[in-house]
Amino acid sequence: MKQFLITGGTGMVGSQLVNKLKNRDVHITILTRSDKQSDDPKISYVNWSKDGWMSQVPDIDVVVNLAGATLNKRWTPSYKQLIMTSRIQSTQSLVDLFSQREHKPEVLFNASAMGYYPPSLYHTYTEKYQTHPFDFLSDVVYQWERFAKRFESFGTRVVLGRFSMILSNDGGALQTMKLPYKFFVGGKLGSGFQWYSWIHINDLVRAILFTIDNPNAKGPFNMAAPIAERQNLFGYTLARVMHRPHETWVPSFLMRLALGEMSTVVLDTQKVLPNKLDALGFTFNYSNLKIAFEDLIDA
C-alpha cells in the first residue's frame, strides 16, 4: 500500500484528487490547518499548524503539494504577502519534514501556474521556455518551484504542474465567469484577444496521477488542454452553452480599476501547450471547450 501525503487536500483540486485516490490501494494523509477526524480508514488528517505534527506523519511514498492562498481576492500588499508565504512556507515545511527522515518520498507533485510565462498575444509556450520573474505572479511561481526543487537533493522525482485556468463546478474561475452571463451581461473583457489556456478538473486530476505514476515524468508540465481560446471566443462559447447573450464589453481600464493588480489574471495571459503530457501519451477527455462547458454547466 502506497502512502500519499497531500497538502491542500480539502480544496477544489485536492478534494477531487482524494476522491480519485480512494479507488486505489493507498493510504492518504492530508495536512490541514484545523482539527479534523476521518470516517474513512484510507484517510488521516494531521493539523500541521500544531507543534509536533511531523511525528504524526507516517513514512510517505508520494507527496502532492497543492497548498496556497487563493488568487481570487483583491491583491492588497498584505494579501500579496500571504499568496507568496503560504506557498513558500508550506513547501519549506515539507522539506524540513523529509530532511529528518531516512525514508524519502519517491515523487513530489508540486502545483505551479502558467503565470511562469510572460503574457503574450502571439507567442505559444511549451515547457522548454525558460525565463526569470518579471512581475509579482511570476515571482511567486518562480520561488515556489525553486523551493520544490529542494526535494531533488533527497533523490525524489519532482514534477512541477503548471496549472492553467481550471474549469470546475466546485469553485475557481468558471463560477466567477458564469455570473455576468447568468444576469445577461456577459461579454468581451478588455481586447478579447488575450488567450485563455484552460483544463477540465477531470483531466487535471487524471494528469496529476499520470505524472505521479509515470517514472519518466519530471520537471515542469503544462497542465492545459491542447486547444487554448481567445477570451472573446471563450466567452461566446460559454454564452452559447448557457443560452445567454455575449454582447457586453468591459474595457481594460475598467477591469484594472475594479480588480487592481489581480486583473492581470484576466487580461495579461498566455497560450500554453501540454507538449510533455502529449509526448508521454496522456489523452484528454475534454480537449474541446464547448464539450467541457456542457459537462459542467446545467443549461
Curated annotation (Swiss-Prot):
InterPro entries: DUF1731, Epimerase_deHydtase, NAD(P)-bd_dom_sf, SDR39U1. Pfam families: DUF1731, Epimerase. Belongs to the NAD(P)-dependent epimerase/dehydratase family. SDR39U1 subfamily. This is Epimerase family protein SH2119. It comes from Staphylococcus haemolyticus (strain JCSC1435).
